[in-house]
């Protein structure tokens, strides 16, 4: 496994903090006029949502720093809100957000007030933290960030990362809202992930695949060790992992901790003869993992078969093989952003596009296995438009275009300067697939004028007609 130093994505020693001038400008609104109350804690300052978001993004310079000490210190200073909550903790290379969405829909169908913590967001930060599928409002975001920032300033030497701060923010929101169950998605890995400070009712490991190898390890076995790090003593485990080595590691760790392991069984297979709300064989697998988790916890949280079916059928999770109609044109948005995700997308396409090939609009990040991803996707398309992803980590359109030409078996390939330009180029194509990065899907959701976190009673991506942002097909 990688040593501790290999986990820090910079040349600084582990835990080092490099403060830059622009950060002082960003956080100034949080410090201006700050006084301390009688208990020694800094009084919160009113900040705007723009100031709150600027502060949150300033924390991204500290990258990913593995370990739980900072998160535990923050949780203790905040009064350990996690101790007042019940959790289902979900890890996995792919599908963990979808499994959380299925579980959230099922337990809401059973009448529970739920908390949903996932990442990343597509458009708005509040999508990460939802109470009964209502995203955190801008006003509540600003209030909580101001209060939590004030608290952090009282803790000597503590400089949280973006995800550490966001995790404690979520715990505060859920405790204040009085949610009855939290669907709690890991950020990266599991063992050293900030979410791993909780004691859940169940631990779920959806699957294990190759992603984030520079952090989690180069092999499936190494990555499985990190995912299995969420397993707690005596807490049951549900897994859909089918790789033999990964499954063996998960089961070995569970035995060490006297944690029973449950896989997908006959009841879930029978249940999945009914329709589910998300598209593709991989989403059937995710639904089965969610259903197995519900079955495991029925003694603690009763859920009827009809409520389970209702939740599975009603779930919405934008950007996961979701269809947008634009006149007679179908645009499919899928956030496949790593090799396992692209393989799952390829397997699902015959179900949603049984005739013909789509025009493919794709952009990818440079720290993924993008050459292999492009090699898999290019032959599936009628023609290809490559675009930059709205991230500093984007693959250049020149490099991605070359990879697509090499793999595309003579299909036309163009490079667009932006996604909006690419969408104008494909207005005449009856079917368009946009994929390669969740950041790209977030940009598409914005351009198409869609609501990115549809809950019950709202129009889903399947039902939206874009409000004139782009010319009709």
Describe each region flagged by the PLM.
Residues 240-262, 295, 330-333, 339, ...:
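C-terminal helical cap/extension that packs against the catalytic core
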Residues 389-391, 455-473:
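Short, flexible loop segments at boundaries between secondary-structure elements
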Residues 5-13, 17-94, 98-113, 122-123, ...:
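N-terminal leader/targeting and accessory segments in enzymes
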Residues 103-108, 174, 377, 404:
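Hydrophobic alpha-helical packing residues
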Residues 422-450:
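A glycine-rich beta-strand to alpha-helix segment
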Residues 187-194, 198-258, 360, 370-372:
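Conserved catalytic-core segment of NTP-binding enzymes
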């Amino acid at each position: 496994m990688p040593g501790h130093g290999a986990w820090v994505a910079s040349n600084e020693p582990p835990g080092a903090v490099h403060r830059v001038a622009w950060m002082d400008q960003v956080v100034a609104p949080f410090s201006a006029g700050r006084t301390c109350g009688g208990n020694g804690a800094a009084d919160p300052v009113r900040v705007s949502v723009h100031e709150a978001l600027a502060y949150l993004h300033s924390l991204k310079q500290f990258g990913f720093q593995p370990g739980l000490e900072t998160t535990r210190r923050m949780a203790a200073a905040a009064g350990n809100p996690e101790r007042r909550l019940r959790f289902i903790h979900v890890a996995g290379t792919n599908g963990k957000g979808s499994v959380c969405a299925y579980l959230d829909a099922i337990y809401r169908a059973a009448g529970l007030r739920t908390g949903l913590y996932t990442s990343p967001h597509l458009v708005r930060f509040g999508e990460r933290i939802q109470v009964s599928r209502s995203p955190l409002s801008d006003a509540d975001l600003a209030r909580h960030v101001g209060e939590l920032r004030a608290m952090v300033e009282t803790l000597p030497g503590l400089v949280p990362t973006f995800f550490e701060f966001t995790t404690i923010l979520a715990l505060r929101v859920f405790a204040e809202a009085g949610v009855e169950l939290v669907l709690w998605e890991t950020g990266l890995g599991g063992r050293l992930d900030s979410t791993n400070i909780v004691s859940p009712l169940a631990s779920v490991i959806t699957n294990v695949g190759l992603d984030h190898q520079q952090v989690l390890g180069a092999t499936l076995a190494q990555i499985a060790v990190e995912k299995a790090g969420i397993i707690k003593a005596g807490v049951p485990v549900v897994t859909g992992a089918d790789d033999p080595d990964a499954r063996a590691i998960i089961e070995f760790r569970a035995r060490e901790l006297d944690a029973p392991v449950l896989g997908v069984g006959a009841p879930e297979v029978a249940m999945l003869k009914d329709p589910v709300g998300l598209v593709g064989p991989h989403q059937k697998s995710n639904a089965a993992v969610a259903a197995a988790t519900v079955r495991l916890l029925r003694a603690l949280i009763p859920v009827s078969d009809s409520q389970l079916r209702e939740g599975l059928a009603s779930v919405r999770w934008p950007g996961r093989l979701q269809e947008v109609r634009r006149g007679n044109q179908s645009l499919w948005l899928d956030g496949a952003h790593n090799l396992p995700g692209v393989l799952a997308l390829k397997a699902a396409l015959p179900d949603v596009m049984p005739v013909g090939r789509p025009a493919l609009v794709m952009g990818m990040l440079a720290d993924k296995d993008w050459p292999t991803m492009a090699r898999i996707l290019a032959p599936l398309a009628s023609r290809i438009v490559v675009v930059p992803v709205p991230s500093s980590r984007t693959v250049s359109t020149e490099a991605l275009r070359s990879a697509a030409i090499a793999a595309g078996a003579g299909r036309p390939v163009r490079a667009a300067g932006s996604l909006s330009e690419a969408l104008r180029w494909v207005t005449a194509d009856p079917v368009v697939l946009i994929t390669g990065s969740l950041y790209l899907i977030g940009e598409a959701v914005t351009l198409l004028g869609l609501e990115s976190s549809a809950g019950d009673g709202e129009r889903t991506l399947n039902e939206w007609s874009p409000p004139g942002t782009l010319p009709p097909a």
